[in-house]
Amino acid sequence: MSEKGRFSAGLSRQAADGNKADAPLPPVPFRNYQIGKKELRNLIAWSFARYGTARTAQMADALKTLGFKYATQAAVSISVEDLRVPPSKRQLLAQAEAEIEAATERYTRGEITEVERYQKVIDTWNQINDQIKEEMLNNFRQNDPLNSVYMMANSGARGNVSQVRQLVGMRGLMANPQGRIIDLPIKTNFREGLTVTEYIISSYGARKGLVDTALRTADSGYLTRRLVDVSQDVIVRESDCGTEQGILLEYLMDGDKVVVSLEERLVGRVLARDVVHPQTQEILARRNQEVDHDLARTIAEAGIRQVMVRSPLTCEANRSVCRMCYGWSLAHSRLVDLGEAVGIIAAQSIGEPGTQLTMRTFHTGGVFTGEVARQIRAPFAGVVRFPKNLRTRPFRTRHGDDALQVEVNNQIILEGPDGQRESFDMTQGSTLLVRDGAQVQRDQLIAEVSLAKASRKSTEKAQKEVVADLAGEIRFADLPIEEKTDRQGNTTYTAQRQGLIWVMSGQVYNLPPGAEPVVKNGDRVQAGDVIAETSLVTEHGGIVRLPERSDTRSGREVEIINASVVLREARVRVESHQGREQFLLDTSSGQTFVLKATPGTKVGNDEVVAELIDNHFRSQTGGLVKFAGIEVARRGKAKQGYEVIQGGTLLWIPEETHEVNKDISLLNVDDGQYVEAGTEVVKDIFCQNAGVVEVIQKNDILREIVIKPGSLHLVDNPADLEVKSGTLIQPGQPVLSSIVPDRLVYLEHVETPEGPGLLLRPVQEYEIPDRPLVPTQESTSESGRSIRLRAVQRVPFKDGERVKSVGPVELLRTQLVLEIDTDAPQLKADIELIQDEKDPDIRRLQLVILETLLLRRDVEADLTQGSTHTRLLVKEGDSIASGDVIARTEIQAKKAGIVQGIREGAEVVRRVLVITDDDLVQVPLTGPANVEVGALVRVGDELAPGIPSPQSGQVMQITDGQVLLRMARPYLVSAGAILQVRNGDLVQRGDSLALLVFERAKTGDIIQGLPRIEELLEARKPKEMCVLAKRPGTVQLSWRGEEPDLKVIEADGTVRDYSVLPGQSLIVVDGQPVGVGDPLTDGPANPHDLLEIYYEYHRQTLGDDQAARLALREVQRFFVNEVQNVYRSQGVEISDKHIEIVVRQMTSKVRVDDGGDTILLPGELVELREIQQINATMAITGGAPAKYTPVLLGITKASLNTDSFISAASFQETTRVLTEAAIEGKSDWLRGLKENVIIGRLIPAGTGFTTYEEIAAEPEPDEEEEEPAVLPELPPRLILEDDQLIDDSTPAFDELEEDDDEEE
């Protein structure tokens, strides 16, 4: 009997029969075997079920005392000496090094790709690591069984094998922070000490561990919160809902291995149907019977594979679960009590282990083959025979070895020399590593048998870069190329099948932009010879100026002056103005200009250089502008105003404008009122002039207050006047008989508080000359380019414009503007100060048009380029024409050699190749050569009999007694690789040659642990979903090249096509039968699709109600199993019923598609039970039923969709939830725990359960009986004689409750 069996034999159905008050305590059997963690757990459980809490506590106490007693008798400690490194370690490492050396050699010969080399290295180290671990354990076992380290790890006191392995074996492979495995393992252990490199690599993992833990805690806490919120209102409210429904429990499998056994899943359940023995037809258990450990074992031993049990998923209790459907309360192995808050228990049971789930374990390079394929090694030496009908296709393993892949299940036979025969079954997809008739040694690897869907292994496409290890010229060997152009017009080149890219060694020079080679292919150059040169050319020509600059780091500058102009008549002085320096220009005519462009800056065409300081054209306040005879044009930027073309008079009608933004209540004057200067027109605003007020307001907000100066005359009837408002009146022209102005005025009609009136406003006149009074400077250079300073008058306003201002306004500006002749307007002029030739104290302004050319500084040769040398070809003051060369930069060869690789044609030459003596190698021969000139040889190939080639390369010449090789390096690229170079390209060392596209195995751990649980419970669409079968049928599978063509022939003969996305691998074979909703490719299933497929399928044969229920049932099963798989894979045990409660909350709603005659609206989410009741009512009244689709809600969505808006609002999106509840006038019935906690009432669970339940079901007053005020007497045997304890597991309490019931 297994140890577990021995214990759980005791976990009998004592609730049903055993230890009533008068039954003697059952005898205690003597047990004599080793007790580990698991056995200890079973022991306590057994004692608890058999003898109750008090005795178990006593026993646990005794065990503790026992443990401490012996733990303190003696002790072990570990010293450095105890860390014994297995002696065979060195030899194993050497073996691994040799294997890897061989793989690297194959890689340098171009026989395997970079990916295959990497994979081989990783797998080799993993295997060796395991072997060292075994050796280590054997070493301890045989030579030093009492070693303290070994004892600790072995007994489970501290540490485990993998930790000991790091102490005395080897630390093994490490992953980098991106999760890629570094192919340099840590060969040492902590006992020997790590090298510096190993230490750095090793510290990656430690940091990652800390960060992960911190993130995990937060994630796990949030998951628990969402779970509690979704299931907090699930409380046991009924004893039995009486449902006939149930769910089928069976073994939970993952591939071939049992994850949870049926026996384990049955314990604590209530049966929904009688269980009948399959052979004897004897009834083993009846419906509604609880399953304890004994019964579960009996059922499992009878060979029954499926049992129908009651479950929270099928419970029909309204908004809760009943005791029968929930089953045992796991805390004390008997039926759950009424009022138990099972929802919260479920949520915490699922959420709590969250922290133990890894975020995602490191993604190990390849999976160790052990998991995916079973390795077959020859049990004896012999010959392999294949049967005639064995169908295989050639296949390349992930280590780059040639093998055969079996297409149809079959077997192979191994025949020994002494007539031994052994046959091995080969399943479809297995790999044969030997050929028919091959001789094999004992323990040689013959084949890897693929296990049917063993681990949920899937592959993903990944890319790996192939990098050139040497500089040189590209040569493709037997590499057919396919060209693809995408929609954007980008062309990619891919390899159609595998081939070689050779890099022929040579020195590659990168040429700078604009460099031209001065040598031809085949030229011989010496060190220091010029290979290429760039010329520096002037664009515009002019006079050379070489500025004095000490800063030669960035190279020297050469300036070429195209044109210059000096203001001979004006001198420059500096004033400081408001703490800033200001440059002023005084002309000989006494005018002063402010420089707008400071010396040292550049000025473009039509930009302002200086502006005249002039107060003649300054007004006192704002006003109206009128032009008389002035013509203007807009030139240059808008904000500079209008240029005056024709002079004339500018008429200015002053007015004072206050722009305000205040309430109208603050206004102190009326519209049209005449005010004196200094009046407060608005609070805190005073006017400067006397005049008539105009108030501009909008929506009782003041915008502007305008004060118009002038003389006001009241008139009775302004309409009779001949002069219109807004006209200019000349002096002496009468307006009315009584009014004759003596100067030019502007007439305006106004409405005053006293009545209509005329306002005569004074007009100021400014005379503007045709030409400004400033001379224009001009100069023309030898090249014919001219530059000048032109004086311009600009008016900032247009005719009739109102200028809003309180203070003074400039009405005319006189500016000096730079003009460069039109053929080169993009040039800019530099502003410089120069000393006067006669008087050094006087500084003049000079404008120069410069072209600045930068000379490259000389560069010493490095790996990728030769040294450069720049020669200047001009002197200070030289006059040069445009297009002249002023300097040449030469690129010099580093070593002597022959020039190659200059491509003829239109393409720009960016690189030049020189083949030097370093790139050639001479091999002396003893016999005739068996290679030809031009042949590509790999390292190790024979050049002549018995003479292997020391290098890979190309044969350049064969002379008597020697072969001249040009070194080269072959790189194997696999089919489908993306090529980054073309044939004949020149590459530097470190350039990318190609991207290898390969499939790498994704182990189940990619989305594993917490992220996967969250994805499931939030019902999210997985990233790479599998294809699901929509109807049952038979698979028909054919291949179009690499692309699978997948069809399913359904029962009625319909053929349905399924499209398989690239990167998805099939998990079905030709002719395989599939059921509805079965996955056809690898990857996680999308639960929403699953629900839809099941619903559509069942609807064709059953009614909507039945179909919805069955579809939801299937999806519920899927969820329970998936969640269990994740937790079990991490070694966490959770009872199914907890997951079922949460899943029930996720799958209880349907979406209304059409309300029919009901009061439901389309799109509404309703409980399935509710809508089925409504439809039943409709069937009686003859109305049209509501149509609906079952939906799946993630836990967050389900929490927000509960009946209780208080609970939803306290979870997330408070404002939205409360607003909607208010608009819809919702009521909260306070059924759950959370609502009641928030309101501050007693919660309806535990003792508070009865409070509310009784209020609900209170009897009529006349039926009420007198209740005894005290409890009925205690049964005498409640107090046990021996340990004087009331024990809550003694069924005396049950009797108490029964008495209560009888009295009620």
From Swiss-Prot:
Role: DNA-dependent RNA polymerase catalyzes the transcription of DNA into RNA using the four ribonucleoside triphosphates as substrates.
Subunit-level organization: In cyanobacteria the RNAP catalytic core is composed of 2 alpha, 1 beta, 1 beta', 1 gamma and 1 omega subunit. When a sigma factor is associated with the core the holoenzyme is formed, which can initiate transcription.
Span list, region Disordered: 1-23, 1256-1304
Annotated EC: 2.7.7.6
Reactions catalysed: RNA(n) + a ribonucleoside 5'-triphosphate = RNA(n+1) + diphosphate
Acidic residues: bias regions: 1256-1268, 1294-1304
Similarity section: Belongs to the RNA polymerase beta' chain family. RpoC2 subfamily.
Secretion signal span: none
GO biological process: DNA-templated transcription
Transport recorded as keyword: no
Keywords, sorted A to Z: DNA-directed RNA polymerase, Metal-binding, Nucleotidyltransferase, Transcription, Transferase, Zinc
SUPFAM superfamilies assigned: beta and beta-prime subunits of DNA dependent RNA-polymerase
Any one annotated GO CC term: DNA-directed RNA polymerase complex
Annotated binding of Zn(2+), by residue: 241, 315, 322, 325
Residue ranges, compositional bias (Low complexity): 1269-1278
Protein source organism: Synechococcus sp. (strain JA-2-3B'a(2-13)) (Cyanobacteria bacterium Yellowstone B-Prime)
Protein's recorded name: DNA-directed RNA polymerase subunit beta'
Gene Ontology terms for molecular function: DNA binding; DNA-directed RNA polymerase activity; zinc ion binding
